């Protein structure tokens, strides 16, 4: 069983499944020095800032009037809170915020909402230390692995570090990762059902004796490398920030004003009873890009629905692509005119 670095409900049970459902997006656990009211208020304000980052995938401007107003009335955003004990007599405050109010605050500061179904990222990280190169696992580099785990959790980024067991090592080597050879890396990543794959290398640059980290998505150009320089732990954490930033730009939905009131028509097949119809409607409404679902017509076992979107058609397409419960009906050999327009089959959750 592979070891996942993020507390999630795994909703992929077949090769068709592209994403996982992230839990506790609107919850944050933060270290506190005591249980006084002032400590709770200070920690709650910091936690709200971190939750805004998790939900949107973007860094929020703390100086914005909307955010400053929100932290002055922080109890209004809190759904519940509780204290928990940690190691070495540490105390943590666990706060759950009200989702609707967080979403409204993001809209008011001009930031998008990244839904709770997010692409799983497989990270292959090679480290060169004293001329020895090795891939990161929990056993080989436990501190780096823990840092990746903590950082990805804070950013709401589902992340898996490959096991590097015999099956992996028969397909991919540290040289493949170091040299950004996509083919073996992508092949080895198939067992993890990752939607996106990142290869990275961490080493000391001999020219300035400083740690450097080069990373890229495996589906990008060989030359599309992102370079980070600085403290080793800092740049490893920065890589996770950068990956989350780039994916949020690709997948997050920003509220837009539509001339047509944001209405979009879609056809669903594969519904044969009322229970399935309700499941379909609830599933669609769970997508952050969809505000409302209206059933318009049922004809020839096809359910014609009208969606009210908070994003655009591309946002909807990306959200449905990530959702395993829907499969787009599309014939790559047919002409554009012959293909059904905006038609999906409901396959449900396996």
Regions found by a protein language model. Name each.
Residues 45-66, 119, 123-178, 280-310, ...:
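N-terminal segment of the mature soluble domain
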Residues 2-8:
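Sec-dependent signal peptide recognition
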Residues 31-35, 96-102, 126-130, 164, ...:
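Solvent-exposed coil/turn segments that connect beta secondary-structure elements
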